[in-house]
A protein has these predicted regions:
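Active-site neighborhoods and metal-handling regions in enzymes and metal-associated proteins
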Residues: 1-198
Length: 198
C-alpha cells in the first residue's frame, strides 16, 4: 500500500487559470450566501434558523455548501469552530458567518462578522485591529516568503496590541477542490509561497 495523499496534495497546490476562475465564481456565490444571512438577521431567529435560510437559498440555485454552514452569535462567535445551536441572535452582539459554496467542483470558504445593533467602542477597536492584521498579511504575502512569515506578519499586529493569547488559530489555508488545501498559513510552516497557490 502506497499513500499517495502527499503527492496528490502537491499536484493540487498550484492552480491553473481555469481553476482560479472556478474558485472566483464559488467565491461570488459565497458572498451571495452571506448576503442571504445578513438579510435574515432578526432577534427572533436562532443561529440554526439563519443557517437553514442560507443553505436553502443556495440549494434553490442548484449549489451545495462546501462544508457545514456556521452562524454563531454572542460568546459562541468567539470560537473559531463553534457549533451552531438554537441560540437566538443577540442585540448589540457580534454575529459570525463561516460558509462556502461548491461550484463546478471547486470550493469557496469565507468568514464574515457583523454587528447586530450598534457596536460599542471595544468591538470597533477589535474590528479595526483585525483589519490591520489582515492587511499586514496581504501586504506581506508574495512568492518566495514562507507560510510562517505570512502568519507572523498578521500575528505581530495582534500581539503588539496585547491580544496575542487570543489568536488561537492559524491565519488561513488554501482552497481548491477541497475546502482545506495547502498551504496552511500558520506558525511553523516553512512551505514557500508560490505563484498560483490559492
Amino acid at each position: 500500500f502506497n499513500n499517495l495523499t502527499p503527492r496528490i496534495q502537491r499536484m493540487r497546490l498550484i492552480k491553473s487559470a481555469d481553476e482560479v476562475q472556478k474558485m472566483m465564481v464559488a467565491g461570488l456565490y459565497a458572498e451571495k450566501a452571506v448576503k442571504v444571512g445578513f438579510d435574515n438577521i432578526s432577534l427572533d431567529k436562532t443561529e440554526t434558523d439563519i443557517i437553514a435560510q442560507i443553505d436553502f437559498a443556495m440549494k434553490r440555485e442548484g449549489y451545495e455548501m462546501s462544508f457545514d454552514t456556521m452562524v454563531l452569535t454572542g460568546d459562541n462567535a468567539a470560537n473559531p469552530h463553534g457549533i451552531p445551536a438554537a441560540n437566538k441572535v443577540e442585540n448589540d452582539a457580534l454575529l459570525l458567518f463561516d460558509l462556502g459554496v461548491l461550484v463546478n467542483g471547486y470550493a469557496s470558504d469565507m468568514t464574515r462578522t457583523v454587528a447586530v445593533g450598534k457596536p460599542d467602542q471595544f468591538k470597533k477597536d477589535i474590528y479595526n485591529l483585525t483589519l490591520e492584521a489582515q492587511q499586514a498579511a496581504l501586504d506581506f504575502i508574495k512568492p518566495g516568503v514562507t507560510a510562517h512569515e505570512v502568519d507572523r506578519a498578521a500575528r505581530e499586529v495582534i500581539e503588539k496590541a496585547g491580544y496575542g493569547e487570543y489568536f488561537n488559530h492559524r491565519l488561513g489555508h488554501g482552497i481548491g477542490m477541497d475546502v482545506h488545501e495547502f498551504p496552511s498559513i500558520m506558525e511553523g510552516n516553512d512551505m514557500v509561497i508560490e505563484e498560483g497557490m490559492c
